[in-house]
């Protein structure tokens, strides 16, 4: 009831203005362990059936918040308190950048979807690392999503990713290379076998922490599988599928710029993930993101082969109860099918 009133006010504002107001509150809450404890007591949810050990990291539950919400690593404590099993911060770039011109964030309310053309706006890796350390340690794994600065030419992209990773080596529990945002010109062109191989070979030499590749939902299936295979062969530990889509046919009134996320992406993301899991289940840790907004969809992705999940748009539309609702219902679905834990259900449809 409270969030429905707050949502009505927030949705009367420009989408980015509303996000900034929420972030300001979350930053304030993150500075207070007491307030974070109150949030956790109201909206957190813990159940041993949902716990899992993946790549040496303990996940209290499989539901994470996707990159893009906490771009500067300034509100992780508060977000964890809302029940997430892990968070992915960023996207961070080597140098600070302002991103694309506003307006650059839009709602498609009927489709419960968002369209963003943000362009990796962030304060840069150095300031983000300081912010991370200010509030560390954290109660869940934290991923760091890494991107390329807009001004960097493609020929120097590998050096730029090396530079941003180098500045983040002492923060986070895993790293995700973002080559799939549609909002940095030509970034998606880096989703090719040769570059991905170079990128992960380089990163593997720099860190022993888990490395992930985040892919676009708009690749042809064969191209996607080739890129993913190249990443895994070069040392990637996991694949996150998918980023936002540039398929404007999925909403009634799309804006010209930006990628779409939310319920409009559910079917497309699920289909991509199904093909990914068929080829790489048990060969890599698979993370499903895109249009997940309830326990039923979350459970389907897990049975399809997802060890972990991520949400974003659904959190905007459904508010602070979302994690708790999904996780409680997920436990019921596991019990109904006779699974003793979420770990047992991973990839059940492939067995």
Swiss-Prot record:
GO terms for molecular function: dihydroorotate dehydrogenase (quinone) activity. The active site is at 181 (nucleophile). InterPro entries: Aldolase_TIM, DHO_dehydrogenase, Dihydroorotate_DH_1_2, Dihydroorotate_DH_2, Dihydroorotate_DH_cat, Dihydroorotate_DH_CS. Its cofactor is FMN. CDD domains: DHOD_2_like (cd04738). Keywords: Cell membrane, Flavoprotein, FMN, Membrane, Oxidoreductase, Pyrimidine biosynthesis. Substrate binds at residues 71, 116-120, 178, 183, 243-244. Gene3D superfamilies: Aldolase class I (3.20.20.70). It is a peripheral membrane protein. Its main location: membrane. Transmembrane segments: none annotated. Its EC number is 1.3.5.2. GO terms for biological process: 'de novo' pyrimidine nucleobase biosynthetic process; 'de novo' UMP biosynthetic process. FMN binds at residues 67-71, 91, 145, 178, 214, 242, 262, 291, 312-313. It comes from the Bacteria. One of its GO terms (cellular component) is cytoplasm. Pfam families: DHO_dh. Catalyzes the conversion of dihydroorotate to orotate with quinone as electron acceptor. Monomer. HAMAP family: DHO_dh_type2. This is Dihydroorotate dehydrogenase (quinone).
